[in-house]
A protein has these predicted regions:
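Amphipathic alpha-helical packing segments from all-alpha helical-bundle domains
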Residues: 109-134, 141-149, 153, 168-182
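Append "Primarily bacterial transcriptional regulators
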Residues: 26, 30-34, 42
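N-terminal intrinsically disordered/low-complexity leader segments
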Residues: 1-5, 187-200
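Amphipathic alpha-helical segments used for helix-helix packing
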Residues: 90-112, 116, 125-127, 153-160, ...
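Alpha-helical structural segments
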Residues: 5, 9-16, 20, 34, ...
Length: 200
């Protein structure tokens, strides 16, 4: 097994453990045992549990971005749906991983950088698909940023409470996206029509 193959194997095993156990209950010894390697070898690839988790979460973020391509040739709601479904599916299958990143390690700068980088990439793709320019693009950019944070919070609430189902999460998120973009367009139209507001 090449070093890259070994590393990928360790990531896969770690991902399985973090997906089903709280962060504090995942031990590096368990990862090494499942992989059939010594702890010393595991630590050569990942100096600690934090580094292992960060590598797993970064890999997941990259995969989700690959599944979240936005085609400007189709309506935005349709273009976004596939990426939203991919994220919801990942959250459902990796509940403990997502809660670890957003709750247990919410103050970890490495994890937060991974989350912020993904959100920034998603916003840029969606914004480009809107084909806007100037001030209207700036308003839509802020609206999309707010929407992406909303989706994150909505999914975390769903994972933690289970007070609503996946279909409701999806429906609310898509409806909120359309409302946010419509509001951004309305604000732009109002600003253009109101000379006093333009001066302000």
């Amino acid at each position: 097994m090449t070093p890259e193959e070994r590393r990928n194997e360790l990531l896969d095993i770690g991902a399985e453990l973090f997906a089903t156990r709280p962060y504090d209950e995942v031990l590096m010894e368990d990862v090494a045992e499942r992989a059939g390697v010594s702890r010393a070898l595991l630590y050569r690839y990942f100096p600690g549990k934090g580094e292992l988790f960060a590598a797993i979460y970064r890999h997941a973020a990259e995969q989700l971005l690959d599944l979240s391509r936005v085609d400007p040739a189709v309506p935005l709601e349709e273009a976004v749906s596939a990426g939203l479904d991919a994220h919801i599916d990942y959250f459902a299958a990796n509940r403990c991983t997502v809660l670890t990143a957003n709750r247990t390690l919410c103050g970890d700068p490495v994890i937060q950088a991974i989350i912020n980088d993904e959100l920034s990439a998603l916003r840029a793709r969606m914004l480009d698909a809107c084909c806007l320019a100037g001030r209207q693009r700036d308003v839509a950019s802020a609206a999309l940023h707010a929407w992406l944070v909303f989706v994150r919070v909505m999914c975390l609430e769903w994972l933690e409470t289970q007070n609503f189902d996946r279909g409701e999460v999806r429906s609310v998120c898509l409806r909120t996206l359309l409302a946010a973009l419509a509001a951004a367009e309305d604000c732009h139209a109002t600003s253009v029509a109101d000379p006093l507001e333009r001066k302000l």
